[in-house]
């Protein structure tokens, strides 16, 4: 008799995606981050659901409702900090996942890659709106500064900003709609993740060599399920160490001050995972130019398949490209650090140089290095 998991309409889908899925035999731990992102998303939805039960999306009570969650709700403090630090873990996994895709040429699967970029944008939008909800000083001023960037769009900019605000400033209407969107977006992300997986399973996974692994596949279960469980345990360990020992390490002290439209904080900055993009935005003195550079810094990922000039997809056997890739990583870390510093000398010039380097590496140096490697290999 055939096993029920292979015949039942619903179990068959699960079976083909997580049990009998043919996977390359040589994929490394860099391929763990997809499942870790799934775990992060589930964790964020669950903790967020419990937070939403006690949170009130009103300017007069939002801040005190978060305080109430931490002080009066049973284990409210751990739920709140798991949600806040869970977002940081989510972005660490996201950046690793995207970095793996760039290094090993996973952008060859264009549908999967493009949906991945849309997922990145959706996650960034969700995290931004979530940061506004506690209604602290940094929440309010972060929302004011970032939404105001849309006013740089010619003709419709000002109207667009006021439409998003629901008034003439960030106020009750803004907070209510941000809460509504912050609640619905993770479910949209989950649906997009399903489509992401659907396209991935059409082509099969990439592997470190970048060569087709059709001749050498192994079942996903038990080999990669056990590997993913190890990754999940390490992720939860890291998250709980952060939550239980240093929950405010990645937060901003200004967000423990209730929002005050009459008092601007000395240094407005977003959460650490947006600092690289914020540094690029700040590097350009022109408002519209800065906004375009900010959007392009992420949107440039969609161009990766078009910028690929090498005859090999993976960087595994391409030392020059490897070197440039790690310079790019160092450049992004520099941008992240600069974005968190005040707008003064020498941080302005460091940010500008790092921003130029970022676009130069992706658009010019890496394609040139790939062509050079082709010539060295006489291809």
From Swiss-Prot:
**Does Membrane count among this protein's keywords?**
yes
List the membrane topology term(s).
Multi-pass membrane protein
Q: Tell me one GO biological process term.
A: mitochondrial electron transport, ubiquinol to cytochrome c
Which residues does the record give as heme b b566 binding sites?
A: 97, 196
Residues annotated to bind heme b b562: 83, 182
Q: Name one GO cellular component term.
A: mitochondrial inner membrane
Q: Which GO terms describe its molecular function?
A: metal ion binding; ubiquinol-cytochrome-c reductase activity
Q: Which CDD domains does its entry note?
A: cytochrome_b_C, Cytochrome_b_N
Q: Where are the transmembrane segments?
A: 33-53, 77-98, 113-133, 178-198, 226-246, 288-308, 320-340, 347-367
Q: Which domain of life is it from?
A: Eukaryota
Localization, UniProt: Mitochondrion inner membrane
UniProt cofactor note: Binds 2 heme b groups non-covalently.
Q: What is its main location?
A: mitochondrion
Annotated residues for binding of a ubiquinone:
201
Something else the entry says is: Heme 1 (or BL or b562) is low-potential and absorbs at about 562 nm, and heme 2 (or BH or b566) is high-potential and absorbs at about 566 nm.
- Biological role stated in the UniProt entry: Component of the ubiquinol-cytochrome c reductase complex (complex III or cytochrome b-c1 complex) that is part of the mitochondrial respiratory chain. The b-c1 complex mediates electron transfer from ubiquinol to cytochrome c. Contributes to the generation of a proton gradient across the mitochondrial membrane that is then used for ATP synthesis.
- The protein's name is Cytochrome b
Organism, scientific name: Cephalophorus leucogaster
The taxonomy runs: Eukaryota, Metazoa, Chordata, Craniata, Vertebrata
